[in-house]
Amino acid sequence: MTKRALISVSDKNGIVEFAQELTKFGWEIISTGGTKVALDQAGVTTIAIDDVTGFPEMMDGRVKTLHPKIHGGLLARRDLDSHLQAANDHEIGLIDLVVVNLYPFKETILRPDVTYDLAVENIDIGGPSMLRSAAKNHASVTVVVDPADYPTVLGEIAEQGETSYATRQRLAAKVFRHTAAYDALIADYFTKQVGEDKPEKLTITYDLNQPMRYGENPQQNADFYQNALPTAYSIAAAKQLNGKELSFNNIRDADAAIRIIRDFKDRPTVVALKHMNPCGIGQAETIEQAWDYAYEADPVSIFGGIVVLNREVDAATAEKMHPIFLEIIIAPGYSAEALAILTNKKKNLRILELAFDAQDASEVEKEFTGVVGGLLVQDQDVVVESPVDWQVVTERQPSEQEWAAMEFAWKSSKYVKSNGIIITNDKMTLGVGPGQTNRVASVRIAIEQAKDRLEGAVLASDAFFPFADNVEEIAAAGIKAIIQPGGSVRDQDSIDMANKYGLTMVFTGVRHFRH
């Protein structure tokens, strides 16, 4: 019995050559629309879909393959006489191979000029139906959705006259992943169109970006997936100019770095980061000076760390960075001279270029945190704050310099692991106390790191002080200004302690826990 293939593709790369090989093996080819035109023009003999169904394409192509003579040919089980008899009774020819890819829905909704009607018209109905029918009957039918699989299919047909069951099963699994992802994109688009903020079903789809050697530790298997709708300001979108492949930990740290730098747009700023905690942040009038401040903040912890800069890296800055062992440098650009300096004898240094003009758009993405048996979903912590909304709660008002330092410290504190404390002046971080299980311990760590540099320093806390002992420790160190959210039932104790020692303290009203 002559084998039959049904081919209907929007991506025509390689399809002519594929069909030509099938005809050499004696296969009949059924085709539709533009695919049939392309194959006919290439000299491939095809059968029109309406010659099979006896029914014309209609409704602007919306109805063409949704027909029993197509789906019966795909779904008929070859091992059941009743199925074969039904096919014979209704003159349904069996179809042994389906090659289909779908209307470009994703590409359509990414167009800047897309309209709702255009998006809807690019929802494929017949294609997924054929793919799913063929995949369900993979015991007998080969289904191909990816041109990358053409050589495997042709090779097996050439060698043994048909594909192996293992190949058909693998391709069926690929199809179900593909159609599920396609439907997830459509569901996400419609969910956003109707403004559903808490849908009862969460459908998200990600594409494999990079298989990883291992995860956080060598005993953990891992891979890197990126959002199927690409985000322009993301590590997945960064262009790697030098160095080894990014590791699992590199990607997590780099993501933390580009989140931090979003909050520092107005002035040249450099952030040094280690284990997802900032170890040094510097801001100045030039990127070179900002680097100096970030490095000076903690020249020990920066070793083996990640650095992100919000201005193009120039030669002078590169000269200062080059002697330091860094894992990754991220910037919106590099001068040719700077790149030559940074890559000299540094073949493993990962240098990433990332455009910063899409930072605001990246802030609307949800954050996902896996828990055993579930997934937590939240907005990013990107609330817009203004000092005019802050409240001075002490008798002493901040000086102009203290206000500037507190604004800088408050932005920086957002990214320190809770319980998080950070000490800064108006140019650089001086001490970081991250991730302690009690807040006074974080205060002590930050003070110890900042000692001998506390003149004019301020302290920021990501959450309120539960007890006044924190303020007492701060005052004893010589720090004169505190910024914190407030909100404790014992706030007045902290205020009284600040007044006792002549400190100024500001409440922001916004907490910034980070776990």
UniProtKB/Swiss-Prot annotation:
An annotated Gene Ontology molecular function: IMP cyclohydrolase activity
EC number of the protein: 2.1.2.3, 3.5.4.10
Reaction(s) the record says it catalyses: (6R)-10-formyltetrahydrofolate + 5-amino-1-(5-phospho-beta-D-ribosyl)imidazole-4-carboxamide = 5-formamido-1-(5-phospho-D-ribosyl)imidazole-4-carboxamide + (6S)-5,6,7,8-tetrahydrofolate; IMP + H2O = 5-formamido-1-(5-phospho-D-ribosyl)imidazole-4-carboxamide
Entry annotated with the keyword Hydrolase: yes
Gene Ontology cellular-component annotations: cytosol
Gene Ontology BP terms: 'de novo' IMP biosynthetic process
Name of the molecule in the record: Bifunctional purine biosynthesis protein PurH
